């Protein structure tokens, strides 16, 4: 007998019929056209190398890529076999060379990786782009190792096509609680005194420790084994794109890049070869039509961990104003 699902469990589950309906919303490789207007805001089901060769050059403002890490894994009938370091580098070079021509001259690219593949990703990226930074984010999930340090970090490499690129610093500040408020002539210095507490909006660094891996009580959660959180990708998208820009994810997975792009009023193109992942992506995109909230992003800023009570106390009026500002 199947154990009933807890009311608090928000993991996306769909019937076979629902799956068919959502899959029908995707477009196949033979439907891909060089006319950008025909493929924008679409999930393309197919091999990313085949699809990338069909996309128009100089058409993408931002690329967010989460390629397979160099591990032998099988998920939902899709297998990636671990390669030697030279072979994985050749694989990386193959898809990056395809993408380089698609990015606009003022465009940016972010590539996710683990510690083993990070040096390869960084090296190959530098052959095609100007590498700007390496972001390391704390990944608090998984068991510890018995004869090694627990793997609790992942990297995201940030690069640009040229020296002219978008970076919206004010859009990605983090609101942190002020432990020792400092005043000048009785006036708060570099911090805000609010009914929720004393806070300072700080500039983001290249180390992110405020990310939560999606889990069963989060509405964005799917059964995808390596799903990235909406908060993680929203930082990237807010920083390196503007409303109306086109964002490409060549390894879409369960759709986080497309979903966040939609919530933040950007356009998206997602490529994914696994049909089940495409189904989850389309379901999440549908939900994004009625719920544009992003966990941990409230009042136009990102909040540090363990600040839910302060976030929740923000009035509905304040949230409505923030949503209006986001649409501008």
PLM regions: where:
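PRPP-dependent phosphoribosyltransferase catalytic core
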Residues: 276-328
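Core catalytic lobe of class I
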Residues: 1-280, 320-328
